[in-house]
Amino acid sequence: MGFKIAVVGATGNVGREMLNILSERGFPASQVIALASARSQGTEVSFGDSILKVQNLENYDFSDTDICLMSAGGTISQKWSPKIGAQGCVVIDNSSAWRYDADVPLIVPEVNPDAIVDFKKRNIIANPNCSTAQLVVALKPLHDVAKIKRVVVSTYQSVSGAGKEGMDELFTQTRAVFVADPVEAKKFTKRIAFNVIPHIDAFMEDGYTKEEWKVLAETKKMLDPKIKVTCTAVRVPVFIGHSESVNIEFENEITADQARDILRDAPGCLVIDKHENGGYITPLECAGEDATYISRIREDATVENGLNMWVVSDNLRKGAALNAIQIAELLVNRGLIKPRAAA
């Protein structure tokens, strides 16, 4: 007997990717339901070789559904996730709505799988921010060996992190530039085509943006509350794939060679680090891939026990959809949930 799975936000970038990955990985699902708002009702989405008709979230009964993959934004999640959880269905939420709730585990399976047992408090599990997910996958194995004191990260985040509207705006603006049409910025605060924008999410009182704060807060929650983290988040004209320049200061000595060996053996990490032209990974090459790619590992001569590295991953997969499905797999593989239809 398989599990009954509902995907909320099935017509969005991440929702569609969730359906793709459920099929690709052969998740033990007896039934998969595609859900979205009333305006998307009847829309068709792909699930493996099948076509699913999108149903209206408002009319759906979760009482016999085992897992809900929620990717419809924070407002929808705040309204629906507690209701769904109260019906006995486990919600794996991709928004920021529940990440900082003390009763909701924030999970990256390669980093803090044991924390998942706390899901029973509310039947909600939070997926981290896309840029945080790949960062902690790369940091965790190094922290286990040499203990991280401080992290300075600059992110170079693709437009798909802003949804389909962000991807459409980059395409439309790029075309407009080439044909000398006026360029209009709607989704982003400034033109994104052939430009970079040092601003993602709302500004906070201290001058940081909410996106930058998320990286700090989530890294501390999942990895170690004592780690100091500072971040600058930048939107770049790339369709898929987030990149990060990461500077790390450790309490204990660690060399670049040691770091390479550690990361090569670490789950979810793939080291591509040759000191030659093209001996590194860019977001173009990581699109559609599951791994967190790590390149440019080198020692920082300006600080004791310091390293620099370049971290790249597909933000729609490890940064969102893949991590959510890995959480669902963790629930199943550890026997934390059973198919309700079989009960």
Task: Enumerate the language-model features and the residues they cover.
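A glycine-rich, Thr/Ser-enriched phosphate-binding loop motif common to dinucleotide/cofactor-binding enzymes
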Residues: 123-134, 207-216, 319-323
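Oxyanion-binding "anion nests"
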Residues: 193-239
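A short, glycine/Asx- and small/polar-enriched loop/turn
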Residues: 39, 240-243, 288
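Helix-loop-beta segment of a Rossmann-like dinucleotide-binding subdomain
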Residues: 119-126, 195-206, 309-311
